[in-house]
Swiss-Prot record:
It comes from the Eukaryota. Residues 1-19, 92-104 have a biased composition (Polar residues). One of its GO terms (cellular component) is cytosol. Residues 1-128 are annotated as: Disordered. It comes from Arabidopsis thaliana. This is Dehydrin Xero 1. It holds the Pfam family Dehydrin. Belongs to the plant dehydrin family. Residues 23-41, 48-60 have a biased composition (Low complexity). GO terms for molecular function: metal ion binding. Induction: Not induced by low temperature, abscisic acid or drought stress. Residues 75-91, 107-128 have a biased composition (Basic and acidic residues). GO terms for biological process: response to abscisic acid; response to cold; response to water deprivation.
């Protein structure tokens, strides 16, 4: 059988493209299709550009309008660290005052012992 593809007598299908280069579906013209071109609404869109607002939350300090600066809001990690016992920043002061009495003068400072030191203490004759 002969193939009529790409020959002068063959019917060629020309694929139509819209304004963005996308192909239209092939239409035969039957059942009331007017011209085969789809209706494209033009105007009022974002035209592919993202628009951002002028506000930003990434700055560490910002102008308060009165010539001063405001401090940055605390993040979640700072809030958690604040609630944990132990190390706190040196610029923070505690509201508890330290009072000493006469019987507090004989305090003994105990060092934390490692596991090997604890085992060595339990061995007989091994107190070095």
């Amino acid at each position: 059988m002969e193939s009529y593809q790409n020959q002068s007598g063959a019917q060629q299908t020309h694929q139509q493209l819209d304004q963005f280069g996308n192909p239209f579906p092939a239409t035969t013209g039957a059942y009331g299709t007017a011209g085969g071109a789809p209706a494209v609404a033009e105007g009022g869109g974002l035209s592919g550009m993202l628009h951002r607002s002028g506000s930003s939350s990434s700055s560490s300090s910002e102008d308060d309008g009165l010539g001063g600066r405001r401090r940055k809001k605390k993040g979640i990690t700072e809030k958690i660290k604040e609630k944990l016992p132990g190390h706190h920043d040196s610029n923070k002061t505690s509201s508890l005052g330290s009072t000493t009495t006469a019987y507090d003068t004989g305090t003994v400072h105990h060092e934390k012992k490692g596991m090997m030191e604890k085992i060595k203490e339990k061995l007989p004759g091994g107190h070095h």
